[in-house]
Amino acid sequence: KNGNQQLLHDVGEQMQMFNAVAGVPAYYQDKLLAVLLLGEKHDGFGFDQQELDFFAALASDVAMAIRNAQLFMDLKKEADKNHDLFIRTMVVLSQAIEVKDKYTHGHTKRVTDIAVLVARQMALNESADFEEEFYENLYIASMLHDIGKIGVPEEVLNKNGTLTKEEYQIVQLHPRHGVEILSPLSELKESLDGVKYHHERYDGKGYPEGLSGEGIPIIAAIISVADAFDAMITDRSYRPGMTKAQAVEEVKRNAGTQFHPVPVKALVELYEKGRL
């Protein structure tokens, strides 16, 4: 009630400024949301009842529009809050695997950063036309691309020597494990292809399904390049990491066989610009 009185008081003070001769209140339920100010009629006569009824109906429509806008903004704030919580949850999930696999510390963030840079460079080259939503799906898929390694025994993940055939087969299951873990979350539907297919090869010799060429979802093809590049430049117990220059040359050499050529081209351009 005090708010309504204050609004009416403010309007009364400003009516002279707007040369208004009357004001029609716009209420939503018992809350005054606005006042529709009426100027003097051209003919100099006062407003008749029909005209006042029209402006009263218009004010009611204005009040409803304002209330709808307020409700929309409230919903958007709530959605943004929930979305931020969702993203933070994804970050926590991605960190879970790094606790288990000591050789991947920082790997997830680096892959995510590189993947998004590659996608934006592809768009800059006009070799791809991504909606903004794609970048978010890529971001999430990159963060969670190795989440399925939670299902791989630590002695296999952290083995210093060469994996046996059986151990390698266990590791190859991690994309499927990742999808099994994440598929109950409907919000991740558009990111699952990146998790499932980031170990597919352009020549069809990858896993888990042996997809090839353009049959590999582009979100997965981008993560594949970013993942491999970071793995190459990272020190492991059994070998030192390559320099970035060496890794870029290795990725280029495998374009069209292991990697989709388009994200490879974007990665090379990023390196040449000093952005990797």
Describe the predicted segments one by one:
Residues 12-18, 46-47:
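Short loop/turn motifs at secondary-structure junctions and domain boundaries
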Residues 56-63:
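Allosteric cytosolic regulatory segments
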Residues 6, 42, 49, 78-80, ...:
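Metal-dependent catalytic cores of enzymes that make or break cyclic nucleotides
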Residues 62, 68, 75, 79-82, ...:
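Heptad-repeat alpha-helical coiled-coil signal-transmission segments
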Residues 26-29, 41-43:
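Sensor-regulatory modules in signal-transduction proteins
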Residues 35-45, 51:
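Short beta-strand-to-loop transition segments that serve as allosteric relay/switch motifs
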Residues 34-35, 149:
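Short glycine-/small-residue motifs
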Residues 19-27, 34:
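A short, aliphatic-rich beta-strand micro-motif
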